[in-house]
Amino acid sequence: MKMKSGMEQAVSVLLLLSRLPVQASLTSEAISQRLRVSPSYLKKLMRTLVQAGLAESLPGTKGGFTLTKPLADITLYDVYQAVEGRGSMYQGKGLLQSVFEGESHCVLETVMAEIEDKWSNLMREESLQHVMDRVGELYDLEKIDDWVIKQVKGQL
């Protein structure tokens, strides 16, 4: 199973935004520099996250992006749907019907849909808060918090 790199980037952006102090935001320029992605790509990703209701865009010269809700209320499935879209992962071509003539129902499509449902349910159970908790076990969050504060102060 393969996901676009946008999934990891979107999760990273949302986790980064969660480190913001109350009433603060991060510019797309700061986020793109931190993630080492092109500013134009980051703007497209941010538009996607805003349209999905996961991030908010604040206008003005001191504007930027912030989360719309706590990480505990955002699931990996929410992010996946925002980045990958709502279509089915598996698109059958009807080859089984060609091999085993006579049946109009694609068994493989049914099996793949069942697997996709299970996978989707697992992603619905994983909040970004749980991901952040695991990040905190492995990384020094103080470093990113210091970087975030520096960026916020630079906007003032």
UniProtKB/Swiss-Prot annotation:
GO molecular function: DNA binding; DNA-binding transcription factor activity
Domain (HTH rrf2-type): residue spans on this chain: 2-133
Keyword tags: DNA-binding
Tree of life domain: Bacteria
DNA-binding among keywords: yes
GO terms under biological process: regulation of DNA-templated transcription
Gene Ontology CC annotation, any one: cytosol
Gene3D superfamilies: Winged helix-like DNA-binding domain superfamily/Winged helix DNA-binding domain
Protein name in the entry: Putative HTH-type transcriptional regulator YwgB
